[in-house]
Amino acid sequence: MKILRLLTVLVIAALTFAACDDTTEEIGGSITNKIDNINISNSAFNVTTKSIVADSVLSRNNMGLIGKMKDPETGNYVKGDYMTQLSVLPTFDVDTLDYIKQANKGSIEADSCYLLVSYNASYGDTIAPMKVTAYEMTKPMSEDKEYYSNYDAFKERWVSENNQHWSSNYNLSNTSDVKNFKIYLNKEYKKDGKTYKNYGSYIMQTYAEHPEYFKTNFKFLHNVCPGFYIKNVGGTGNMAKIWNTELIFYWTRHKTINKDSTAVSIGYNRFDGTEEVLQLNKIENDTENLKKLASKYQEKCTYLKSPAGIFTEVTLPIEDIMKGHEKDTLNTATISFPRLNNDNEDNPYNFATPSTILMVQKDSLQSFFEKSKLADNRTSYTASYSSTGTYKNAYTFQNIANLVSAMYKNKGKGENWNKVVLVPVNVITTTQGYTTVISKINHDMSLASTRLIVGTDDPDKDYTTDKVTGKKVASGPIRIKVIYSKFKEE
């Protein structure tokens, strides 16, 4: 029963403290439960932050970006290209080839072939004219290595500008529920000394000769279609968030019913970019401009910008938190990062505020994504942007006590032992029955940006004096608020 009462006291104290305003926090007093002989105290400590330029992020994402536009807040240009491979089902089949031959004087031909590029979000001026080119890959990019968003498929010779390619002009003004644009692959296609009517005819004739190439993704990628590199080659003003790229080809079939009658019909096949094969984003940011931006406003704010833009580094005052409390239990540690509104909030072209951010130890940032880890609420956490409530217009981590304790145990092990990084992420969930769980955390590859109030710890500016105790109390713009508990000494 005593354990139960102890847990009850701690929970109530945590909830009470979480709702405290700044004045209450600065009292820094203690609450005593005489029955259970437990002493619970609270305190707050200043936290410092700064912007760090990401340079590149792991490009393992099902979403692609295509286009080029200017960040209205910073003036920085962002350009997106992507590589996609296509998946084939083991049951793939082309309709009765004899009927297709009858429609094409004995030849197996596709009437039309195109890449259907589908997007679920657009940024910028949707009517801005854009131009894209699809290059057939020279060879499939390897699945046994990691690629970052600054990878150069041309330099690494995965693809060449001399490869066969197809271009398309488009805009993003499509107002239907299903948004897409097409890149037609209808010009002559040449391979191994043979000329085909179009890329679809190449696919169909290859299937007729080697159906075994279509049984697995590996065989298909290495013998038929190594994928496409989709590159923005013209236009500035918008970007599209691509959720699927399909290769679709149509054909006509003639079936003789009797001597005087022939049934004419149209058929088609498709290959999709799926999770079973690679989709890789290539992001071009003006890195030098980002570095200037990060340093120019360092005293005012920090940034969260995606894709592959700017993160916020946080230095936690671990030693101060634990000083004098080495033998106490650290029950809760809450920290909130307030957002600064844009100078022009009404600009329709402003990038969206990142919806979710990850807090992860700085030295574990790279391995977290490469090893496909999930936030464990011990050394890594996620927080969603809140526009209402107690912590309005902020990202709040309700309890990182486990992280503080883990850092204290590793005190001094490496220069980043007390540092974490805030990173915009995309959280993917799956639902089984009535339970929804996080299944994947990727870098956010959408166009998102926000400024956070900078955390400082100036002895002359970021402290006040408690009127009762006369002690200095942290009053900086970002504070970590903690609750300790211990048994009272007899």
Predicted feature descriptions by range:
Residues 2-490:
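Secreted, disulfide-rich extracellular signaling modules
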